[in-house]
């Protein structure tokens, strides 16, 4: 009996390891991936980030953290079709209805991944997000993403904002190494209860070390600079108020206006790259069809120019290393076609943008960014504009509430242009408001919305007789008449011989900080801390009996 028992135990001991091997995922540890370089784009104009390969694509670290105007929505040309993601370099396919985990060891940041990346227009992917949500995430990765049927899916993990923020602060030339774990299984486990792919009875688990070096940092600077451009019926531009770097210019046989539209800094570790292309593109398809390639041109130095024609002309990464600005030239015919198409009172940020294409990464190499400066383009016949006297789109102020505290003052320049002076000019202030005791007040709120504090506000300007006229204007969305302001008149003559005039005046919007009512909330409670508000100032002009 003792012998039989011993034999039974030996057989058991031999069989047990074999049984355990058959009841586990197949783990493959790949050799370390070759180190790769990336270019990081810090977009302060649009408040987002973009990362793109500086050389070879795989292992992948590529794409933006936000959608741009190039996002594919189901029709038209396919440009941006997913947000940013990583992989281990093998671009391994996933099986439909299997579950997938991806997690990082030695991750440079906590919570680096949000889920399974997919191409947004492929069947089974989310067109809005390009993301298949997992059952759960943690500080290392995500778990339990079900691979949907339809288009192909791969072992790609979508990058979190925290990952982009880490890359933003990395010095150029520095590197990080991480271990990417990617595991898929047909077992229907519950990741939200703690189960993981690597612990299941079957599946495939891949492990690989990858290293990425920050080879360059391109910082797009939002200068907030603003300028007005008035155009006549023949497209001839006239510069109005503003501080954008613009000048009239002739290039070849074309006359028009050139402006510095993008300001940037580019730091590199010596990276050489010609696959990254940057060029402008007109957003309005009718205008893009109406103008010729040389009616809009762009330059890195303001003297050597390239025409705008889809992807045909561009500046490479290597060319951008020797500059810090991008200039754009608009011919008179460009403006004339705008007039013909009825495109007026438009902001250049709505008219065109710059595109970024990395031909190395076709699925995630497309990106779009706005200009650093803004032009407000208006017709010279019968138009009105208002801009901050600081020539910025979003002037802001801050201060303290209490006796003797200074008001928050905002200065503006109002311009009308027409064959004659406007017969009527009106102005109003809009924003959060509340009527207290029969008077309208602008309402400032705390971040949590619990404290709402009333502030009086006024509009004032100098009249023709030299007096100051002041209106109570508590963000109440009501028009006030400023026709009798002191206007500075500049005559103009159109190319056709017609004459007209441009009239300018200034107006001040003021929010007193020393009014006793602002010491308490609209509910008559005391308050402490910070409150804020934003609003808009609108103007309109009327011309009557114009032939």
From Swiss-Prot:
Induction: Negatively regulated by H-NS. Positively regulated by IHF and EcpR.
Keyword flag Signal: yes
Signal peptide: 1-23
A single GO cellular-component term on record: pilus
Subcellular location field: Fimbrium
Chain's role: Part of the ecpRABCDE operon, which encodes the E.coli common pilus (ECP). ECP is found in both commensal and pathogenic strains and plays a dual role in early-stage biofilm development and host cell recognition. Tip pilus adhesin, which is required for assembly of EcpA into fibers.
Stated family: Belongs to the EcpD/MatE family.
Protein name listed in UniProt: Fimbria adhesin EcpD
Native source organism of the sequence: Escherichia coli (strain K12)
Gene: ecpD
């Amino acid at each position: 009996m003792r012998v039989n028992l011993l034999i039974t135990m030996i057989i058991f001991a031999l069989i047990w390891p074999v049984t355990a091997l058959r009841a586990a995922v197949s783990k493959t540890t790949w050799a370390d991936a070759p180190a790769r370089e990336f270019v990081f784009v810090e977009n302060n104009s649009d408040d987002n980030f973009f990362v793109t390969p500086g050389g070879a694509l795989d292992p992948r670290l590529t794409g933006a953290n936000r959608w741009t105007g190039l996002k594919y929505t189901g029709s038209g040309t396919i440009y941006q079709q997913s947000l940013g993601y990583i992989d281990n370099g093998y671009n391994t396919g996933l099986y439909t209805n299997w579950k997938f985990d991806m997690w990082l060891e030695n991750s440079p940041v906590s919570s680096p991944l949000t889920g399974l990346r997919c191409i947004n227009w492929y069947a089974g992917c989310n067109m809005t997000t390009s993301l298949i949500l997992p059952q759960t995430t943690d500080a290392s990765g995500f778990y339990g993403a079900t691979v949907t049927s339809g288009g192909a899916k791969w072992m790609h993990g979508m990058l979190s904002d925290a990952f982009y923020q880490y890359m933003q602060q990395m010095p150029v030339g520095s590197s990080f190494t991480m271990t990417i774990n990617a595991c898929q299984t047909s077992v229907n486990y519950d990741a939200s209860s703690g189960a993981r792919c690597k612990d299941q009875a079957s599946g495939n688990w891949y492990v690989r070390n990858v290293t990425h070096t920050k080879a360059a940092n391109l910082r797009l600077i939002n200068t907030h600079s603003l300028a007005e451009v008035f155009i006549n019926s023949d497209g001839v531009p006239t510069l109005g108020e503003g501080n954008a770097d613009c000048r009239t210019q002739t290039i070849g046989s074309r006359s028009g206006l050139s402006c510095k539209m993008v300001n940037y800094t580019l730091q590199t570790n010596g990276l050489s790259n010609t696959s990254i292309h940057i060029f402008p593109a007109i957003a309005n398809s009718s205008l893009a069809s109406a103008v010729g390639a040389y009616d809009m041109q762009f330059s890195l130095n303001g003297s050597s120019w390239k025409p705008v024609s889809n992807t045909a002309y561009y500046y490479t990464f290597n060319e951008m290393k020797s500059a810090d600005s991008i200039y754009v030239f608009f011919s008179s015919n460009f403006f004339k076609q705008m007039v013909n198409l009825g495109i007026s009172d438009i902001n250049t940020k709505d008219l065109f943008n710059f595109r970024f294409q990395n031909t190395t990464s076709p699925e995630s190499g497309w990106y779009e960014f706005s200009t650093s400066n803004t032009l407000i383009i208006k017709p010279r016949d019968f138009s009105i504009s208002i801009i901050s006297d600081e020539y910025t789109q979003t002037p802001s102020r801050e201060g303290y509430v209490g006796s003797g505290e200074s008001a928050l003052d905002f200065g503006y320049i109002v311009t009308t242009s027409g064959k004659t002076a406007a017969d009527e000019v009106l102005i109003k202030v809009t924003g959060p408001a509340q009527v207290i005791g029969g008077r309208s007040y602008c309402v400032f709120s705390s971040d949590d919305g619990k404290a709402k504090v009333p502030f009086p506000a006024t509009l004032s300007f100098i009249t023709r007789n030299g007096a100051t006229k002041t209106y109570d204007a508590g963000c109440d969305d009501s028009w006030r008449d400023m026709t009798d302001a002191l206007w500075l008149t500049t005559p103009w003559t159109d190319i056709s011989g017609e004459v007209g005039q441009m009239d300018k005046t200034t107006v001040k919007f003021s929010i007193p900080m020393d009014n006793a009512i602002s010491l308490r909330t609209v509910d008559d409670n005391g308050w402490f801390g910070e409150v804020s508000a934003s609003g808009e100032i609108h103007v309109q002009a009327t011309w009557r009996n114009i032939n």
